Amino acid sequence: MGGTGVVSASYLTAPFYNPALTAIYRRNDDAGMLVPSLGISYDDQDKLLDKVDDAVSAAERDDWPATQAALQALSGTQAKVDFGGAVAFGIPNRFIAANIFGKAYIENVATPDIAPDNPDPIQQAVDTAIKTASVAVTEIGISLAKYQTLYGQHFSFGLSPKIQRIYTYTSVNSLQDFKFDNIREDATSDVAFNLDAGALWFHGPFRAGISARNMLSRSIDTKSGFVTVGGRDVAYGYQYQLQPLYTVGAGFIADYFQLSVDYDLNKEKKFTQFDDDVQMFRAGIEVDLVRQIQLRGGYHKNLARDSEGTLTAGIGLSPLNLFELSVAASYTSPQAMGASVNFLATY
C-alpha cells in the first residue's frame, strides 16, 4: 500500500507506523505475532555503478576523451541500498493494549569524490574516490496504547519506549576497488533510549492520525581520517542525525476496502555531506476478497529530492484466517526497485 500505515496498519504492525493503532483490533483477537517482516530496496537512479564502470573501462583503454566524459557524468551521482527486518508480538487488551517489537535496518549510501581537474584525465580517474557511509539501527521496545471516547468521539493514544543500538560505517575506495561490500571498514556504535508516540481519531471507517518517531534526537559521529587514493589524500568523516519524524495520515478503512494517505511533515536529515534527506508522500489502496486474498497497490515519492515516484503492488494470502502471508514489490525504474515479505499469525 505504498508504505502507508499511520491510519491503516494493523495492531501487529502498529509499532512501525503509529503506536496508537496497537489499541485497534477485532474482538476475537487474543494475541498475534509478526515473524518476520523482511524488506530490501535498491536505488541507483543516477546510474552511479554503470558510470563507475564506464570511467574504469575508459581509463584502462587509455582513452582520454572518454575518461574525461565519464568523470563528468559521474560527478554528483549517488546510489543507495537499504534492507531491514522486524518482529512483533501483540497482546490486545481493553485496559492497555501492548505490542513487544524488535526492528533492525541498514541504510547504505555512496557518492563520488571527483579528483581536481588534471591535464591527464587518466590520473584524475586514478585519484577519484567513492565515499560510502552506512548506518545500522537495531531497536527493541514495547508499544502501549489505550482506546478512549472523548466528547462522543473515538480516539486511541499510544507510546513506544525503546532501546536503540546505532552503528555507523564508512569507507573510501578507488573507482576500481569500489564495492558496497567494502562499506563496513570503519565502525562506531552507540546505545540510546528513544520514544515514539501517536494518536488516532476514527468515526466508522473514516480515520485521521499523527505519529512521531524518534522523538529524542541524536547525532552520531562516524570515524574520520584520511585515505590515500591514487596520488592524493581523501578526507572522510560524517555525522548521522537521528531526528524526530512527524507524519500525518488519513484514510477510509473498511472490512473489504482501504484507502489511505500519509505525509511527512518534516525532512529526515541523515548523513552530512550526502544528499540523502527524506520527506515522503505515500498513498495506498487495498481490496479484500472474502477475507482470503488481499490485493494492494500504492505510490510513494521522496519530496526532498528531485527523484521519480515509486509504484508498489502486493498480495496477501490469509487462508481461513489462520495466518497471513504478504508479498510486495516496488518499482521506480530499472535502476530502483525493492521487495518485501511479511508473515503474520493471529489467535
What name fits each language-model region?
Residues G2-Y347:
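Subset of outer-membrane beta-barrel
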